[in-house]
Design a protein with these regions (language model features):
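Generic hydrophobic, helix-prone segments enriched in Leu/Val/Ile
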Residues: 59-66, 88, 105-107, 208-218, ...
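N-terminal segment immediately downstream of the Sec signal-peptide cleavage site
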Residues: 25-104, 109, 298-315
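Predominantly extracellular/secreted and cell-surface proteins with exposed
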Residues: 71-221
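N-terminal export signals
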Residues: 1-25
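Edge beta-strand at a domain terminus
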Residues: 232-316
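Intrinsically disordered, low-complexity, compositionally biased regions/tails
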Residues: 14-15, 21-22, 43, 118, ...
Length: 316
């Protein structure tokens, strides 16, 4: 969820506009500090968006949005809101690579009050279900001059073959001295939640997931070497199977996340209720991990590890 590892193309992975910087005015992307038409320039830019080149400092990420249900033959339905909070720190590995030590939580909220919820009345089932928070501890990433290999999700995804591609986003200039870019990640991989063991939680034998990011950054800040960290506003959308705790089983349809996002250095810019809830329930998530971990599982894989299959619903 969210700040996800930037996956390489090939096999089950595809990018929309990943390297189409020719669409932009190239002169606006080549500056005195970094060149956004190169892999190394994009690496430095992304490191300053998701982290801070000053490794003593923490970078925070937030998101606020809505989760909607999509079923054939009817209008999309807003179900509940959600809040994202993350904490990250950079570690420089080489001229062409950073590690991003990163933790992330996602809470679900009531659409009207905005309060974090622990249960939800599923209108599709007319049934109350227990809400399960997303706690990605850790979700470490590599930020490199080349597209890194994807996370394995415990061996479910195999690394692509072939030569590495330079990590170049489709940056372009926008009115108001802003640079913007978009990235799309498309995944199709075996599900950990198998229907035979998880009949109410599993949407099927395969996970079909798409994530779409947009980034908006001040162009002058991008070329200012004194700015070791960049304030970034953007959006994040995710198409994903029914959330397992909704107990939809293999019913036709899927979930759509849509959110506005931000990254910044000042914790005071995060929502107070989200920070307070994190301090109370997951205090370790307020700071990044102290060391790199190769084990970064998605929320679906974590659900399989931490939850138990719900009992089958009795027939009337």
């Amino acid at each position: 969820m969210d700040r996800r590892t930037l996956l390489s193309a090939g096999g089950a992975f595809a990018f929309a506009g990943g390297a189409s910087s020719a669409q932009a005015d190239v002169s606006s992307l080549r500056g005195p500090y970094i060149d956004l038409t190169t892999g190394r320039g994009n690496m430095i830019a992304r490191a300053r968006i998701d982290g801070n080149l000053d490794e003593s400092k923490i970078k925070y990420g937030t998101g606020t949005g809505v989760v909607s249900g999509v079923r054939p033959g009817e209008a999309v339905r807003e179900l509940f809101g959600f809040e994202i909070f993350s904490a990250a720190r950079l570690r420089r590995q080489s001229e062409d690579a950073f590690q991003l030590l990163h933790r992330e939580v996602v809470y679900y909220t009531d659409l009207k009050s905005g309060e974090i919820i622990n249960d939800f009345h599923n209108p599709y089932l007319d049934e109350w279900v227990k809400v399960v928070d997303i706690v990605n501890d850790p979700w470490d990433e590599k930020i490199e001059a080349y597209y890194p290999d994807p996370p394995s999700y415990g061996g479910l995804i195999k690394p692509p073959s072939g030569p590495k591609r330079p990590y170049i986003l489709n940056w372009k200039s926008a009115p108001g001295g802003v640079l913007c870019a978009m990235q799309q990640i498309d995944l199709y991989y075996p599900a950990t939640l198998k229907p035979d063991k998880w009949p109410r939680e599993s949407a099927g034998p395969m996970n079909q997931v798409t994530e779409i990011y947009t980034f908006f950054v001040n162009a002058a800040d991008m070329q200012n070497p004194a700015k070791t960290s960049l304030v970034c506003n953007g959006t994040w959308s995710r198409v994903t199977p029914w959330l397992p705790w909704m107990l939809m089983g293999q019913a036709p349809g899927h979930i759509l996340y849509s959110a506005t996002t931000a990254s910044f250095d000042d914790l005071n810019l995060a929502k107070r209720n989200v920070v307070d809830y994190t301090l109370k329930h997951y205090p370790q998530m307020m700071t990044p991990p102290g060391a790199w971990s190769d084990t970064s599982l998605s929320s679906l894989e974590m659900y399989a590890r931490e939850q138990k299959p719900a009992p089958l619903k009795s027939k009337p």
